[in-house]
Curated annotation (Swiss-Prot):
Biased composition (Basic residues): 124-143
Keyword flag Nucleus: yes
Entry function: Required for pre-mRNA splicing as component of the spliceosome. Binds double-stranded RNA.
The encoding gene: prkrip1
Subunit and partners: Component of the pre-catalytic and post-catalytic spliceosome complexes.
Subcellular location: Nucleus; Nucleus, Nucleolus
Segments for region (Disordered): 1-59, 117-173
Signal peptide: none
InterPro entries: Prkrip1 (IPR009548)
Region (Required for RNA-binding), start-end ranges: 50-142
Renumbered residue ranges of the record's region Required for nuclear localization: 125-137
The UniProt record lists the keyword Zinc-finger: no
Name of the protein this chain belongs to: PRKR-interacting protein 1 homolog
GO terms assigned for molecular function: double-stranded RNA binding; protein kinase binding; protein kinase inhibitor activity
Length: 173
């Protein structure tokens, strides 16, 4: 048996048993992650890097031996040709995909701008309508106040009526 040494190891702190919590939705999952991070705020949180977009190997700038698709019997050159051809097709497919993606992005941006312009036009039209209604209500209130004023006086002043007609003419313009 092994000999016991006089130095004893310090007792390890036991972690509190955590109940198993299964997140039911995204907010629960986010809350659990935040709670775990906040248990030890001194520990730095790791933010994963965004994965790099895949791109094919670049084509060689200079190819010394250009071989054809036909090869003699027992020749290993055909395999080299086949790999080069596959890589070139892959590169062309990637470039086609990138151009398609750019085209779709441009169309999307144009559509966003067009929708924004249409929305602004509709908003301006509705704003004008609201302003007209406001002015109409003000005119109705003014007209009622003037009628009440005339009723209280019992008679109409030719000077006041001329002034009110001048004001209404100015407002119509």
């Amino acid at each position: 048996m092994a000999k016991e040494t006089g130095t004893a190891k310090p007792a390890r702190q036991k972690k509190e048993p955590q109940p198993l919590v299964i997140p039911k939705n995204a907010t629960d999952e986010q809350r659990l992650k935040l709670e775990r991070l906040m248990r030890n705020p001194d520990k730095p949180a790791t933010v994963p890097e965004r994965p790099k977009e895949w791109s094919p190997r670049s084509a060689p700038e200079f190819v010394r031996d250009v071989m054809g698709s036909s090869a003699g019997a027992g020749s290993g050159e055909f395999h080299v040709y086949r790999h080069l051809r596959r890589r070139e097709y892959q590169r062309q497919e990637f470039l086609d995909g990138m151009s398609e993606k750019q085209r779709l992005d441009e169309e999307y941006k144009k559509k966003l701008i067009q929708n924004k312009m249409l929305e602004e036009e509709r908003t301006a039209k509705r704003r004008l309508k609201r302003q007209k209604l406001k002015e109409k209500k003000k005119m109705c209130k003014k007209g009622k106040k003037e009628e009440k004023k005339e009723d209280k006086d019992g008679h109409t002043d030719p000077e006041n009526s001329a002034e009110s007609s001048d004001k209404s003419d100015l407002e119509d313009q």
